[in-house]
């Protein structure tokens, strides 16, 4: 986060900087590595799933705590995932992610630029320190990567993806799913407790960190974010801005795909309101982080989250790394 800037990649795409890349930390396998309303399609309010958005080691009372760019306590964000790419016997942190079901991680589509083959990916959960593998952490292979067919890498339109775990993860105090914002109508302002977290750079030209960082942010109106001083109207309709106008807290390299999470007192839970997408540098004045809004993808996500085994949807031989367009998505399939 920048200024301390939470990291994500400066892949120079279309003049903007993506918040994901293979940062310099390499790990051996076994190591765990302005008021604004969130825009979204109209829908009827739905009951919130009970078993999500609760951090047992954090406590609901901390939902209003002000965090100013610091190391996260162990277990503070039990849905935080480190998505890592394997190169030989080395694992490297590339992007963050958010555990939303016991076999599904929500992240940013542009993260797949680093590796299209699902079998090169691992999801590390249950730890804040990527150099350690505590007993409660898990390292699970990825078997499928699902991307919207209308994702545009150059402009970050529809920058969202689902990674499917090879096996269901068992929840514990350090591993929990976060709630999806489907059917939640909430006007978010500077009094709403929203946070970002990740293992990215703590300043724009710095290195990634092995210890999970966290910071409190607030939503920034589209008018302010898209002004001539800022992004000049280039924010995708499926995205929004958050951070601080002066750049005090922001996401940066290595943070892509990580959650922007808000604590909603009426539900006593955390919700993933955004997925870290891109920004112009890290922590720069007038250029806050840009986040994909999961609410726009409710139908798309719900379809896949309800499926048991992706591979059974296709009556054909599955070839490693084959790209299929089906059921309204691009699916990168691996061998299970």
From Swiss-Prot:
Disulfide bonds, paired cysteine numbers? 95-111, 194-262, 225-241, 252-282
Group of enzyme by EC? hydrolase
Glycosylated residues in this chain? 207, 237, 246
GO biological processes: acrosome assembly; binding of sperm to zona pellucida; positive regulation of sperm capacitation; protein processing; spermatogenesis
Q: Which Pfam families match?
A: Trypsin
Q: Residues in domain Peptidase S1?
A: 66-306
Keyword ATP-binding attributed: no
Membrane topology classification: Single-pass membrane protein
* Cited PROSITE patterns: TRYPSIN_DOM (PS50240), TRYPSIN_HIS (PS00134), TRYPSIN_SER (PS00135)
Residues annotated as signal peptide? 1-18
Per the record, ranges on the Cytoplasmic side are: 334-336
Q: Which superkingdom does the taxonomy of this entry point to?
A: Eukaryota
- Segments on the Extracellular face: 19-312
Q: Where is the active site?
A: 110, 159, 256
What are the GO cellular component annotations?
acrosomal vesicle; plasma membrane
Q: Which family does it belong to?
A: Belongs to the peptidase S1 family.
Q: What is this protein called?
A: Transmembrane protease serine 12
List the lineage, top down: Eukaryota, Metazoa, Chordata, Craniata, Vertebrata
């Amino acid at each position: 986060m920048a200024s301390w800037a939470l990291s994500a990649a400066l892949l120079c795409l279309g003049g903007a900087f993506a918040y994901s890349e293979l940062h310099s930390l390499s790990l051996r396998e076994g190591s765990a590595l302005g008021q604004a309303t969130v825009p979204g399609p109209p829908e009827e309010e739905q009951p919130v799933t009970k078993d999500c958005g609760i951090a047992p080691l954090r406590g609901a009372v901390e939902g209003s705590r002000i965090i100013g760019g610091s190391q996260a306590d162990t277990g503070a964000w039990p849905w935080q995932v480190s998505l890592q790419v394997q190169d030989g016997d080395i694992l490297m942190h590339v992007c963050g992610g958010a555990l939303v079901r016991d076999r599904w991680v929500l992240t940013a589509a542009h993260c797949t630029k680093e590796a299209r083959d699902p079998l090169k990916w691992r999801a590390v959960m249950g730890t804040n320190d990527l150099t350690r593998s505590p007993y409660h952490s898990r390292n699970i292979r990825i078997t499928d990567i699902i991307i919207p067919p209308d994702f545009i890498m150059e402009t970050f339109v529809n920058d969202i993806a689902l990674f499917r775990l090879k096996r269901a993860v068992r929840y514990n105090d350090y591993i929990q799913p976060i709630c999806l914002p489907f059917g939640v109508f909430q006007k978010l302002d500077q009094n709403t407790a929203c946070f970002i977290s990740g293992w990215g750079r703590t300043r724009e030209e710095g290195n990634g960190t092995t210890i999970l960082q966290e910071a409190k942010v607030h939503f920034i109106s589209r008018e302010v974010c898209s002004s001539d001083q800022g992004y000049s109207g280039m924010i995708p309709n499926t995205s929004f801005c958050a951070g601080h106008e002066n750049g005090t807290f922001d996401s940066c390299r290595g943070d892509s795909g990580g959650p922007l999470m808000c604590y909603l007192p009426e539900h006593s839970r955390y919700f993933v309101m955004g997925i870290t997408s891109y920004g112009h540098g890290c922590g720069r004045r007038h250029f806050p982080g840009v986040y994909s809004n999961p609410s726009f993808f409710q139908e798309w996500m719900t379809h896949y989250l309800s499926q048991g085994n992706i591979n059974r949807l296709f009556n054909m031989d599955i070839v490693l790394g084959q790209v299929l367009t089906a059921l309204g998505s691009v699916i990168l399939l691996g061998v299970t």
